Structures are given as C-alpha cells and as structure tokens.
C-alpha cells in the first residue's frame, strides 16, 4: 500500500500552547492544533503569535497538523 500524501495549507499562528503546540487559523477560516516539525526544532526556529506558516495535515485527521515552514 502506498502512503497517502499530506495536505499542505498556509495559516497564521493565533496562540502558543504548551509543549510546542500552536493554534493555527487556516486561510479558509478553520482553526487547527499544530506542532513544530523536528527540523524546525533542531534549528531553533522560533514561532510567535501572528507569524504566517505552512502546515502539513493528514487527510485522515484535519484537526491536527505539523508546522513545516515559517514565512519571513
């Protein structure tokens, strides 16, 4: 069986939660909970409320995601 591809969406950080989790508002208005990817953690990339980010989401659970990029 092949692995399903993830859905990429852009969003804006609304608030920082505990354990490197964030509440993100997507461009279509939905709010999801997202965590930082491992590469961003290793490179100490800081994310603050108001930042624009790119997220990956599983097609099976659209309420959770992984932040993979922070726009400048």
UniProtKB/Swiss-Prot annotation:
Q: For the S1-like domain, which residue ranges apply?
A: 1-72
Keywords, A to Z, come to: Cytoplasm, Initiation factor, Protein biosynthesis, RNA-binding, rRNA-binding
Extract the InterPro entries matched here: NA-bd_OB-fold, RNA-binding_domain_S1_IF1, S1_domain, TIF_IF1
Q: What is its main location?
A: cytoplasm
Q: Which GO terms describe its cellular component?
A: cytosol
Please give the SUPFAM superfamilies that the UniProt record associates with this protein. Nucleic acid-binding proteins
Q: Which GO terms describe its molecular function?
A: ribosome binding; rRNA binding; translation initiation factor activity
State where the protein is found: Cytoplasm
The family database entries (Gene3D superfamilies) matched by this protein are listed as: Nucleic acid-binding proteins
The keyword RNA-binding is assigned to this record: yes
In the UniProt record, does the keyword Cytoplasm occur? yes
Q: What highest taxon heads this organism's lineage?
A: Bacteria
Can you tell me which family this protein belongs to? Answer: Belongs to the IF-1 family.
Please describe the quaternary structure of this protein: Component of the 30S ribosomal translation pre-initiation complex which assembles on the 30S ribosome in the order IF-2 and IF-3, IF-1 and N-formylmethionyl-tRNA(fMet); mRNA recruitment can occur at any time during PIC assembly.
Role this protein plays: One of the essential components for the initiation of protein synthesis. Stabilizes the binding of IF-2 and IF-3 on the 30S subunit to which N-formylmethionyl-tRNA(fMet) subsequently binds. Helps modulate mRNA selection, yielding the 30S pre-initiation complex (PIC). Upon addition of the 50S ribosomal subunit IF-1, IF-2 and IF-3 are released leaving the mature 70S translation initiation complex.
Protein name from the UniProt record: Translation initiation factor IF-1
